[in-house]
Amino acid sequence: MMSCNYSFSSISPSSKSAFTSPSNFNLNPRLICCSAGGTVAEPKAINATQPLLLDAVRGKEVERPPVWLMRQAGRYMKSYQLLCEKYPLFRDRSENVDLVVEISLQPWKVFRPDGVILFSDILTPLSGMNIPFDIIKGKGPVIFDPLRTAADVEKVREFIPEKSVPYVGEALTILRKEVNNQAAVLGFVGAPFTLASYVVEGGSSKNFTKIKRLAFAEPKVLHALLQKFATSMAKYIRYQADSGAQAVQIFDSWATELSPVDFEEFSLPYLKQIVDSVKLTHPNLPLILYASGSGGLLERLPLTGVDVVSLDWTVDMADGRRRLGPNVAIQGNVDPGVLFGSKEFITNRINDTVKKAGKGKHILNLGHGIKVGTPEENFAHFFEIAKGLRY
């Protein structure tokens, strides 16, 4: 197990009891005020040519782990809730350049994370592939014509991002200028199996019987669909990178539904194909893979060729680091539910995660997206502690 010694230079007085303070402990750091009442340590000047997150991923020496949180732009923030009142439809918010930029920057302006992720959805490309869908409040994704036959799959079109989702490229270009290398601008896409799960099931699912019936009864049909998604997502990643994204995360949210042997057939080869394709044209673009429920798959994930594996909270960080090996960086993996706890509890969990991750090649994050109802002041506290860490 890797280990490191680190100190905390921006911990609030109420949290000090959780740590042994070093002699140079700074009790009065400069702070940024949070609209929710919390504070975040003011960031130091960052190398204008290389965001901290990119240095960490590439194995360079860094003073602390970079930090950003999945779903950091969104529903837990009061400012986002106000926008939702004005623009109640999700796609009205996620397909409008000005709103995408505004929402993406909301957490950046308050908390200064080391990664600023595009506000969007993994299903955004579907319309451009001739798969009509919507995201309905209280119900989630709805696929109007689920794909379940070879004829259905045949109708799926080639995805051309610059024609189908130009607002994504425009938003990323603006974000890159706004953030100005003080943080890494992050794009993201859905993994082929996860996208296929949505379009076959017709939306979210509890049992995944339809996608599994297709996988086990008509695997050729599913493979044809997965191939179309793999080709399209590779294009989408390149488009995002060319538009300004400095790293891209691939979400395989439903990998948890696959046994290891089925992951090797229906997910791994398509993830590897995406990575190989992107690396041909963008060899230095960091690619992050988040596969939910991947505790039984960890040794297989580096085989995709990604630069970073993002762990969910069901994997012990020290065990995950050991099983993944030294050649990939690691991201995660605080339980999102921890943010409902006390500030001392949150601090202790951050402490535990960073210690187990070891020094370097670690991006501090949650093990899943932020949950609805998370107190904004606890979110602020997470960043205050995280940005005060020192190896």
From Swiss-Prot:
Keywords: Chlorophyll biosynthesis, Chloroplast, Decarboxylase, Lyase, Plastid, Porphyrin biosynthesis, Transit peptide. It is an enzyme of class 4 (lyase). Its main location: plastid. One of its GO terms (molecular function) is uroporphyrinogen decarboxylase activity. It is found in: Plastid, Chloroplast. Its EC number is 4.1.1.37. The record marks D121 as: Transition state stabilizer. Gene3D superfamilies: 3.20.20.210. SUPFAM superfamilies: UROD/MetE-like. GO terms for cellular component: chloroplast. Pathway: Porphyrin-containing compound metabolism; protoporphyrin-IX biosynthesis; coproporphyrinogen-III from 5-aminolevulinate: step 4/4. Substrate binds at R71, Q72, A73, G74, R75, F90, S120, D121, Y198, S253, H368. Disulfide bonds: none annotated. It catalyses: uroporphyrinogen III + 4 H(+) = coproporphyrinogen III + 4 CO2. Pfam families: URO-D (PF01208). GO terms for biological process: chlorophyll biosynthetic process; protoporphyrinogen IX biosynthetic process. The keyword Nucleotidyltransferase does not apply. Homodimer. Catalyzes the decarboxylation of four acetate groups of uroporphyrinogen-III to yield coproporphyrinogen-III. Belongs to the uroporphyrinogen decarboxylase family. This is Uroporphyrinogen decarboxylase, chloroplastic. The gene is DCUP.
